[in-house]
Curated annotation (Swiss-Prot):
CDD domains given in the database record: Glyco_transf_6 (cd02515)
Residue spans crossing the bilayer: 5-25
UniProt enzyme class: transferase
Naturally occurring in which organism (per UniProt): Alouatta caraya
Cofactor(s) needed: Mn(2+)
Record keywords, A-Z: Glycosyltransferase, Golgi apparatus, Manganese, Membrane, Metal-binding, Signal-anchor, Transferase, Transmembrane, Transmembrane helix
EC number: 2.4.1.87
Domain comment (free text): The conserved DXD motif is involved in cofactor binding. The manganese ion interacts with the beta-phosphate group of UDP and may also have a role in catalysis.
Record protein name field: N-acetyllactosaminide alpha-1,3-galactosyltransferase
Membrane topology, Lumenal segments: 26-376
Biological classification of the source: Eukaryota, Metazoa, Chordata, Craniata, Vertebrata
Gene Ontology CC terms, in alphabetical order: Golgi cisterna; Golgi cisterna membrane; vesicle
Pathway this chain belongs to: Protein modification; protein glycosylation
Reaction(s) this enzyme catalyzes, per UniProt: a beta-D-galactosyl-(1->4)-N-acetyl-beta-D-glucosaminyl derivative + UDP-alpha-D-galactose = an alpha-D-galactosyl-(1->3)-beta-D-galactosyl-(1->4)-N-acetyl-beta-D-glucosaminyl derivative + UDP + H(+)
Amino acid sequence: MNVKGNVILSMLAVSTVIAVFWEYINSPEGSFLWIYHSKNPEADDSSAQKGWWFPGWFNNGIHNYQQQEEDTDKEKGKEEEQRKEDDTTQLWLWDWFNPKKRPEVVTVTKWKAPVVWEGTYNKAILENYYAKQKITVGLMVFAIGRYIEHYLEEFITSANRYFMVGHKVIFYVMVDDVPKVPFIELGPLRSFKVFEVKPEKRWQDICMMSMKTIGEHILAHIQHEVDFLFCMDVDQVFQDHFGVETLGQSVAQLQAWWYKVDPDDFTYERRKESAAYIPFGQGDFYYYAAIFGGTPIQVLSITQECFKGILLDKKNDIEAEWHDESHLNKYFLLNKPSKILSPEYCWDYHIGLPSDIKTVKLPWQTKEYNLVRNNV
């Protein structure tokens, strides 16, 4: 073969190789990754890998590592900004709570839950956080029989003034005689819902059956209406701000007469036959059933478990010493509350006013049992 023929054949061969190669790298399957086997499943996306390898190599003959690093830095920057944004939506205990401000009292439990006393919380930080969350707080109260005319109006009027000021509140009022409910003018962000409940012959049964009623209403509608729910006795009156520092997953109230007493002296249910039984040597605090709360799901758990215990006691023909309160204390022994309110939040002035009570949020009303209870 002459020289001219060899040159032509060589040129054809080179052209063919170049054409095949070019077609290959531009095909969906084309990639340099065929030369090794990767165990990384993300490396099997050949089209993505081809886009990474080839445009850079043919960009003025220089692979664009710098651009790759800049893209990585941008991604890291976005992740860092997202973390910072997430941090601003989280409220950590140490952001608002300082137990050292009240060294003379118990401010932290053995399970590291805060005991909220006046002076231990930063109200500004809490208000700023919850304002952004746009929360709704429910307050449920029972007024049965003569409790309606003796206590209900003053309770709701004072709650309208002091309870969760600046936040949306729904008052759930459970009564056995709806026409007797007084008209109460509420402030902005407050609404009032009245529900009729079945009356019971004994006040003990009213207290115990309230656990069932609370649970039923949470399931029926409250869980969809509020972010937090408090259940309170009606024979109390607010006299100072009861605010967002009290909000938590599950919230228990220290009983004013028992917060300095040794647990073995608490009036727990001590009979083994009762579902509310707590043996000597056990117990953390004595909790008052006049106030408890938390998220709707947690309050549902509290009321359902307490009512189970009440039904079991009825089946065994026994009644716990302090009825629903005994079962509440048993519940919180087994399921520790995430936050505890000091006696400042529910105080009895008959005790006096010791130095550790800096302010009284919600004092007890005078207990006129002879006027409001059918069976004393």
